[in-house]
Amino acid sequence: MRPVRENSSGARSPRVPADLARSILISLPFPPDSLAHRPPSSAPTESQGLFTVAAPAPGAPSPPATLAHLLPAPAMYSLLETELKNPVGTPTQAAGTGGPAAPGGAGKSSANAAGGANSGGGSSGGASGGGGGTDQDRVKRPMNAFMVWSRGQRRKMALENPKMHNSEISKRLGADWKLLTDAEKRPFIDEAKRLRAVHMKEYPDYKYRPRRKTKTLLKKDKYSLPSGLLPPGAAAAAAAAAAAAAAASSPVGVGQRLDTYTHVNGWANGAYSLVQEQLGYAQPPSMSSPPPPPALPPMHRYDMAGLQYSPMMPPGAQSYMNVAAAAAAASGYGGMAPSATAAAAAAYGQQPATAAAAAAAAAAMSLGPMGSVVKSEPSSPPPAIASHSQRACLGDLRDMISMYLPPGGDAADAASPLPGGRLHGVHQHYQGAGTAVNGTVPLTHI
């Protein structure tokens, strides 16, 4: 011990307790060079009780070599043992070496140590309020009758089927428990009641706080499940297809309401007149001899100039049909039936083939016996199909419009400049087709 006393008796002896206390208070490792520049005048202000609050930092010099003349042998060995076992923890054996601050620090550290030792076996008696709260969170609920019964059955089934998953075992145990009678369940129910009574005695302040986070997420996902099933790329197409299907299958939809106005003049005149207005070829409805129509590739088979609004159609119907005809003109299918026009308006934004298929389905479903009034066809069909379509269209038009015109015959209708004169352009347009449709009545009109 002689060299140690010589080393610690000079200028270094009053400097060591301050360095050690500073490292204890801050609980951070300090490099050795910062310890060397510590002024020696701060030694008398430090108290020895600070040595028991926290362990010296790992980077600090070894205390037994510098505190041999200050601490007794048992305290020095206990300090060294604590440093080896828990470098950053709290020494619990040096309670008798400090001043008034030592008992409090030692008591807290011993309580924490006791709480850590007893954390697996329930609440500890020497733990503080915080320790008791953490132990209370670890308290499990008392087992019910099924858990009491399934505890032994699960072990047996796991031994019999080592490769079976725990979830499958739980399913089988639940099914077996439901098959048991009340007499067979009675002992397990009594055992569960006894366990609950014991649990209430041990933890009188226990309150069950369930964690419902996962279940709430499942509830939220349940409402958003239909939209989540669709791939992200097909969302818009599926929405448009659903709208088209709803418009086609609805009993009182846009197509059916448009069909009520079909009997007035036999044609959805709004489509043609609106296309003319959009293209800058608008003309007043009272003109009896219109100029020749412009050449339009999608509708080159129909005379748009000869088909105007009927004076018998109410203004509300005209404005209503304008909306549907606008969507039909935008999608490129102006020569289809009113219900097909409505379906095309619902299917706006899809591919042309998809819109044509939806329009054809809507026309077939909503027109009923009037299904062949105007056929939905591509813009350039074969000549045979075109002539057949023209014969059907002209025959149906003449037959339906003659119901609402004053009596006078076809010649008077063709020659008069009044409402019947709008058929003049239609006659001129379809004369080249060589179709004799006078006096023909289609079967679909009956």
From Swiss-Prot:
Molecular function GO labels: DNA binding; DNA-binding transcription activator activity, RNA polymerase II-specific; DNA-binding transcription factor activity, RNA polymerase II-specific; RNA polymerase II cis-regulatory region sequence-specific DNA binding; sequence-specific double-stranded DNA binding
InterPro entries: HMG_box_dom, HMG_box_dom_sf, SOX_fam, SRY-related_HMG-box_TF-like
Major location (coarse): nucleus
Sequence ranges of Gly residues compositional bias: 96-107, 117-134
Subcellular locations according to the entry: Nucleus
Ranges spanned by the short sequence motif 9aaTAD, renumbered to the chain: 399-407
Cellular-component GO terms for this entry: chromatin; nucleoplasm; nucleus
Chain segments carrying region Disordered: 29-48, 87-140
Function: Transcription factor required during the formation of the hypothalamo-pituitary axis. May function as a switch in neuronal development. Keeps neural cells undifferentiated by counteracting the activity of proneural proteins and suppresses neuronal differentiation. Required also within the pharyngeal epithelia for craniofacial morphogenesis. Controls a genetic switch in male development. Is necessary for initiating male sex determination by directing the development of supporting cell precursors (pre-Sertoli cells) as Sertoli rather than granulosa cells.
Subunit structure: Interacts with SOX2 and FGFR1.
Clinical note on disease: Panhypopituitarism X-linked: Affected individuals have absent infundibulum, anterior pituitary hypoplasia, and ectopic posterior pituitary.
PANTHER family, per the entry: SOX TRANSCRIPTION FACTOR, TRANSCRIPTION FACTOR SOX-3
Protein name: Transcription factor SOX-3
Organism field: Homo sapiens (Human)
Encoding gene (name): SOX3
